[in-house]
Amino acid sequence: MRLYLVRHGIAVEGLKGGITRDSERPLTDEGREEMKLVAKALCKMNIKADLVLSSPLVRARQTAEYIAEAFGLDVKLTDALAPAVNHTQLFKSVARHEGAKEIFLVGHEPDMGMLVGNLIYAGL
């Protein structure tokens, strides 16, 4: 199995413009444009993605949608990629998708960086 870890694109800062919760913050115009380019570039890298798992927060979901669209896939939302979630929960969520060999995980910092550390430490 191959995991591709993606931190969401550039998001609107703070609570403004009618946004009342951090979970509602969308990507900025720059963030959307950047993620469109990233998704196109990923397609050129000979990645054979089977699955796109994403945090349910708006900015991560939007990022995942660009990637999924580029690969002709749907986005599966999982609370296991929400901020500050135990990585054991994420591993269980990934394991539920038995046939998937190449998976994009779209989440947040510092969680994605900590996940990389845990994967390296575990020798996965």
Give the positions of each predicted feature.
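Active-site-proximal alpha-helix that buttresses catalytic centers in soluble enzyme cores
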Residues: R2-V6, I10-V85, K92
